[in-house]
Amino acid sequence: MFGAFRFTNPLSGGLLWKIPWRMSKFQKLRQRRRLRAVDNVVATIENALAKKGETVKAVERWRAEMPTEAEMLPKDKYTIFDRKEKRYRKGIHKLPKWTRVSQRVNPPGY
């Protein structure tokens, strides 16, 4: 289309909010800190309950199933399983609300 209303590259490019294909080092740093913060909260709850001589099934299950930040591979810290992706992995920053959702466990072999 020519004239005053012709297409420009940004207008014909699709989504306005583009997501880069890889996370920046600052996003990775914040992700590691979030994982450590959750680990600290779980440890604090576990210690407080241990002082009282009590246990909670949810905390025990979390400890049994979820790895800590130090135990996780970088692949698991920064990517998640997605069956629609070519290599079955996509960056965790492409997940909606990725800063609020705990994504620590992926299917075995992926």
UniProtKB/Swiss-Prot annotation:
Keywords: Mitochondrion, Ribonucleoprotein, Ribosomal protein. One of its GO terms (cellular component) is mitochondrial large ribosomal subunit. The keyword Ribosomal protein applies. InterPro entries: Ribosomal_mL60. The keyword Lipid biosynthesis does not apply. Belongs to the mitochondrion-specific ribosomal protein mL60 family. This is Large ribosomal subunit protein mL60. Component of the mitochondrial ribosome (mitoribosome), a dedicated translation machinery responsible for the synthesis of mitochondrial genome-encoded proteins, including at least some of the essential transmembrane subunits of the mitochondrial respiratory chain. The mitoribosomes are attached to the mitochondrial inner membrane and translation products are cotranslationally integrated into the membrane. Component of the mitochondrial large ribosomal subunit (mt-LSU). Mature N.crassa 74S mitochondrial ribosomes consist of a small (37S) and a large (54S) subunit. The 37S small subunit contains a 16S ribosomal RNA (16S mt-rRNA) and 32 different proteins. The 54S large subunit contains a 23S rRNA (23S mt-rRNA) and 42 different proteins.
